[in-house]
């Protein structure tokens, strides 16, 4: 009975070992498939990231070129407006100076006319009146021209103020857009760093450092180590069960089983080897 039980347990252990080997083979195949899928995904992610970086760089370059072009155009327009205002101011000063000179001339001529009226005859009076009318007409034309120039000057100054305000607002919006872009970029980088696991980092660094042959060698050694570890755990568990059975359930198991399993010569060798630690009961069992 005991021999049949031992044979049955041996068969069970062999079948369990075979099942374990099959399971480990299946796990190895599944791991290889998963590793291939992970490598494909990583390649795809790297490709997508490179494409995103290229497109983003192109878009940012185009936006910066457009913004620089618009700012340069606005600055050029502002410079032209400033030059126009300076020219109009110079023209206004010359016109004011000429008007003051004309007013002085008119006052002088009016004084002369009054003096002539008092001293000269009627013909000279008519000539002076005609000249005075001509001078008044030219003065009116110059005054109209001065009003026109003043209106243009006011319009140009208003345009300059509006342009400066628009440029200020445009610069503020540009700063806001730059800050928002920097914040978005930082958020993306932080989310990437948070989402990445330390194990994934090590895995990616190892993938970047090592060659495919080194990767496969490492994986194979890891798998062998795992298999050996699990097998040793299994045998340690079996030995612990055996020790528990011999210690607490059936202490005479070895005494009953050894003579049936081993021959007399092997039992004699065991007796010689384990003689100091043998009890009287087992010593009586062994051959003399």
UniProtKB/Swiss-Prot annotation:
Main localisation: endoplasmic reticulum
GO cellular component: endoplasmic reticulum membrane; nuclear membrane
Protein name as it appears in the record: Transmembrane and coiled-coil domain-containing protein 5A
Entry keyword Nucleus: yes
TM region(s), chain numbering: 224-244
Annotated coiled-coil segments of the chain: 10-192
Membrane topology, as annotated: Single-pass membrane protein
Keyword NAD: no
Family membership: Belongs to the TMCO5 family.
Compartments where located: Endoplasmic reticulum membrane; Nucleus membrane
């Amino acid at each position: 009975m005991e021999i049949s039980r031992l044979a049955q347990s041996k068969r069970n252990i062999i079948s369990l070992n075979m099942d374990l080997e099959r399971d480990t083979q299946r796990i190895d195949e599944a791991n290889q498939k998963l590793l291939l899928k992970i490598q494909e995904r990583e390649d795809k992610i790297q490709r997508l990231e490179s494409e995103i970086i290229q497109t983003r760089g192109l878009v940012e370059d185009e936006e910066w070129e457009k913004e620089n072009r618009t700012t340069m155009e606005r600055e050029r327009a502002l410079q032209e407006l400033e030059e126009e205002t300076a020219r109009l101011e110079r023209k206004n000063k010359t016109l004011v100076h000429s008007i003051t000179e004309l007013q002085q001339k008119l006052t002088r001529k009016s004084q002369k006319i009054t003096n002539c009226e008092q001293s000269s005859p009627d013909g000279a009076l008519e000539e002076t009146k005609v000249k005075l009318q001509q001078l008044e007409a030219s003065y009116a034309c110059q005054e109209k021209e001065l009003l026109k120039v003043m209106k243009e000057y006011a319009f140009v100054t208003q345009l300059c103020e509006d342009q400066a305000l628009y440029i200020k607002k445009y610069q503020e919006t540009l700063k806001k857009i730059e800050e928002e872009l920097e914040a978005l970029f930082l958020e993306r980088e932080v989310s990437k760093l948070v989402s990445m696991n330390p194990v994934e980092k090590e895995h990616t660094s190892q993938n970047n450092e090592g060659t495919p042959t080194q990767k496969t060698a490492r994986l194979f050694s890891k798998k062998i180590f795992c298999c050996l570890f699990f097998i040793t755990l299994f045998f340690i568990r079996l030995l612990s069960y055996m020790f528990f059975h011999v210690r607490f359930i059936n202490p005479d198991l070895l005494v009953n089983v050894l003579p049936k399993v081993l021959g007399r010569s092997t039992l004699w060798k065991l007796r010689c080897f384990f003689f100091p630690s043998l009890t009287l009961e087992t010593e009586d069992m062994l051959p003399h």
